[in-house]
Amino acid sequence: MSTGFFGDIAKIKYEGPDSTNPLAFRHYNPDEIVGGKRMEDHLRFAVAYWHTFTWPGGDPFGGQTFQRPWFEDTMQAAKLKADVAFEFFSLLGSPFYCFHDADVRPEGKNFAENTKNLNEIVDYFAQKQADTGVKLLWGTANLFSNRRFMSGAATNPDPDVFAFSAATVKTCMDATKTLGGANYVLWGGREGYETLLNTDLSRELDQLGRFLNLVVEYKYKIGFEGTILIEPKPQEPTKHQYDYDVATVYAFLQKNGLEKEVKVNIEQGHAILAGHSFEHELAMANAFGIFGSIDMNRNDYQSGWDTDQFPNNVPEMALAYYHVLAGGGFKNGGTNFDSKLRRQSLDPQDLLIGHIGGMDCCARGLKAAAKMIEDGALSKPLSERYAKWDSPEAQKMLRGELKLEEIAALVERDDINPEPKPGRQEYLENVVNRYV
């Protein structure tokens, strides 16, 4: 049944690249076969509950601009928000959604009331999922908005906050399992510091490692079959976050013996904040074997902060999905639109239009990436560039069969005096442009 929030808008359909209908897909065709697989199954789109239905449209210099009928902290409002959300998922044809606990339930006066409220809304979501066929890509706990978390959650100097945070994550993992979630995400928005003057770095990292081990242990205890994901971000809201980027997360996982247990959820905007490209972080995750899922958005390159805009750059998407596909594609993960409207975008249609544009952009990027892989457009030049490493002597060096002094003797014996080979960057950039 329609809530009326979106008026008489019908389900969004694919109309092809010549369509000028703003409420239609021009490139995203769920059933189109790309690289032997349905486009919908490649991309696994999800809608972010927080930015789409909870964000009030504020910024550091101004408050709420959006007027939503569910903007009250009551269970009745939470259920109305759920009604609108699942109507939105159905109109858009999004197969998945994601949420924080605080996005979906009213705030209680204590932990027990929060848990009661979450359990009630989980039951409501379960029925909505059954009615619509929409699934949960991942759940997570908001351990950063409430003032109790201002000095961190797992890394807080107060063990009571650590305990409260651990208990909250337990209930959110239970909720995620109940709803059949494919993943559980940890984002350490307050797990970092503002100044080292009041920070015991070693202690906080040990606390964070213990916390993550507790999460993994509980995953096995309850039989949760999804993937545990960490979402890297270098800063904002803290000056420095401990999960700075993919490489930092991998070092942290190795230190705590969790590199086989936890993967990463990579957000494009966070990669940019860390001084990386999106494809850099995806390639690093593949290299370390910890790629899990992506949060799709973009930052304004001039602003210098996390603007969470919908993607609109096809070449960027092509290179991103190239690395997703090169790593074997999504398994439990997907493409979550961690994107929000601009605060002047007041019309309910804007929610649909933003997602439609983002989905079309991703679809174009996916098709370009799949074609590049099919043609070997980048992989063939790459194989040629490293071909000499396949020689017997090179393989001996790589396998550790030659000691340093033996390598030195080999260079002297064979009078090895290498000349540089061309990198062909301009050629490869032109190749990519042919596909997009």
Swiss-Prot record:
It is found in: Cytoplasm. It is an enzyme of class 5 (isomerase). Binds 2 magnesium ions per subunit. Its cofactor is Mg(2+). It catalyses: alpha-D-xylose = alpha-D-xylulofuranose. GO terms for cellular component: cytoplasm. Mg(2+) 1 binds at residues 231, 267, 295, 338. GO terms for molecular function: magnesium ion binding; xylose isomerase activity. Pfam families: AP_endonuc_2. Keywords: Carbohydrate metabolism, Cytoplasm, Isomerase, Magnesium, Metal-binding, Xylose metabolism. The keyword Isomerase applies. Mg(2+) 2 binds at residues 267, 270, 306, 308. InterPro entries: Xyl_isomerase-like_sf, Xyl_isomerase-like_TIM-brl, Xylose_isom_bac, Xylose_isomerase. The active site is at 100, 103. Transmembrane segments: none annotated. Belongs to the xylose isomerase family. This is Xylose isomerase. The lineage of its organism: Bacteria, Pseudomonadati, Pseudomonadota, Alphaproteobacteria, Hyphomicrobiales.
